[in-house]
Amino acid sequence: MVKKYGIEILGYESCNMKRRKFIKDTSFLIGGLSLPFVGSSFLSGCSNQPAFKISLAEWSLHRALRSKSIDHLDFISLTKTEFGLDAVEYVNSFFFDKAKDQKYLNEMKTRANDYGVKSLLIMCDNEGNLGDPDSNKRNQSVENHYKWAEAAKFLDCHSIRVNARSDDSLPYQEQLDLAAEGLTKLVEFCNGMNINTIVENHGGLSSNGAWLSSLMKKINHPRAGTLPDFGNFLIKNEDWYDRYKGVKELMPFAKAVSAKSHEFDANGNEVRTDYYKMMKIVLDAGYNGYVGIEYEGNRHSEYDGIHLTSKLLKKINNQNS
């Protein structure tokens, strides 16, 4: 296992280590002679590794879930049978009253195991503001997230995704300090269960890449990280932060990545985000984990939007493998 850019990497780096060890050992044995045919066979497992993996965020099906045309428990099977993916990112809104329902959580876990689908994280909303200026409300928000961390642990997730919201009317630094105080308490709780607490750019100052990266530096904990979203860079009103700059600033702390999509052209390219440019930023940061499809557009059906996003990501993956 190798650490690069603060991220543990197993694939390409470990193959390099294997290659170096092989060359060293064989050089010792045969006086430095090169045996490429032996090396090629020995290292065959190191080639054609995917640059990243693809998962599905439950929000991609939010309209179907809200209309009850599909049930939250069906999300896992759909991910595998309809979209051919093997990892999911849950949204707490779709099982909001089930965080402590052991029977329900066990059913989720059983279905994931039956379909060979990994549960990666739970996106947590509607649990108060972790940077609330009122200390009682801030502490309550921290405690509100405990049950989701416990559920994530049971489901074998690696993280909960939270929001670093404060009072938008407060100064930049004050919001940073308040968010850091609330998040630090939550991070310390989650750390006891080996669960990461990751923050998404999700409105307000969290959509300012410099602010959110500063928040990570202030918290300075290995269990605190980011979930860079390709599209969520609207701070307020019409104040947009540059998405490419923002993702680049957040990638050093990334423990997950959200490939937001809305609309595709006739060539299969996303209209709002240059996926090739964005994924280069992601890969250049040394990230090789899951990239989560999060389609939320209206131009295509949810199913079509997911398939289009998946097709584009797979195309980019093939070009970088």
Task: Identify the meaning behind each predicted range.
Residues 1-17:
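Secretory targeting signals
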Residues 26-39, 77, 111-228, 235, ...:
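Active-site acidic/histidine proton-transfer and metal-coordination neighborhood
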Residues 87-89, 121, 161, 258, ...:
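Conserved beta-strand positions in the central sheet of alpha/beta enzyme cores
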Residues 89-108, 167-170:
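Glycine-rich, proline-tolerant flexible connector loops at the mouths of alpha/beta enzymes
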